[in-house]
């Protein structure tokens, strides 16, 4: 089929879209069924069905040997999380790290350094303009009273998550326009290592149902879908892996279920800022216009999402369903990205260890945003992949799989409790002899 015929078909379908009011390739809701090819169709709400890839190792007939008893004098994987977050009325945020974060344990090339003792962030412009005193004016700025102060003081036990451990589940969440197919290399890799994996298609993506109402694609609606999937498959130690927009849902679940989320992996997720849809965006155009522009959008995604634009990348874009979604769903997804709660304070409150993976050729997410995320998070490790871009899990699957696996196996170095030295016995003082007496 020629490109001219493809463009003509897109224009024709766009006119039908304007006349009929619905996109011609709308996906109808599916029944909740268990398929024989490893997919499950879960009805999270009446008429709202998500396709889920759920795979894992075969059940072990004999129970594994009991783990060795820990030395009572050694705190294995125990991390003390101490942090004070102060929000001022003028929009200033001060984050003070009061404890020692174990960031140096996973350091290497392109890793993040030790967190600063205090981090100051400007959340928003103060109402009423800039109230700071001019330099050289001789006036001193009055100290502002904090709007609220958040104290974090808890202990986290961070352990190695190995394959075939019955209490470990890996959740993979894709972003806008993708599907669970983008995780194929990661799903196959970790299943071979004995891990249990869960990967859903977001509503309107892949083989999940596509409601024809924009409210079905707001952040809150999609977050509740992910909550339903998480609570259905979660076990004791759960690891969340998100890509792009999917990182926001991982953050949401980690904040909602701190006792169940053991580790988080964010791949090209961006900075720790609240979500707000752009008012001046191409995605605000009518659905029929977006449908006519779909070939151009796909080409733009290939240019921005991949470091190279060769035959291999075009095949990955097609087979991996990296950008394959109806114009209606795309428009609703972009306009529904409203999440004011997910700001810097929200991210600073997380105490779960986080691995940040960034492809250096990413034109959607600048590296400065992931660096900012690493600064805000309490336990964060940033890894940069020089030859990768936004779809780094498709471009560099071996590198990504290695980084993810190393992070799953990582645990902090045990800290032995300081041994108490025995106190010296008190010496009895002899009375001084009286004058003239012999000693």
Curated annotation (Swiss-Prot):
Gene Ontology MF terms in the entry: hydrolase activity
Main location (coarse class): cytoplasm
Alphabetized UniProt keyword annotations: Cytoplasm, Hydrolase, Inflammatory response
Localization, UniProt: Cytoplasm
GO BP: negative regulation of NLRP3 inflammasome complex assembly
Record protein name field: Protein ABHD8
UniProt entry tagged with the keyword Hydrolase: yes
Quaternary structure note: Interacts with NLRP3 (via NACHT and LLR domains); this interaction is enhanced in the presence of NLRP3 inflammasome inducers, such as ATP, nigericin, silica, or alum. Interacts with ZDHHC12.
Active-site residues, record numbering mapped to chain: 244 (charge relay system), 362 (charge relay system), 390 (charge relay system)
Record GO cellular component, one term: cytoplasm
Organism of derivation: Mus musculus (Mouse)
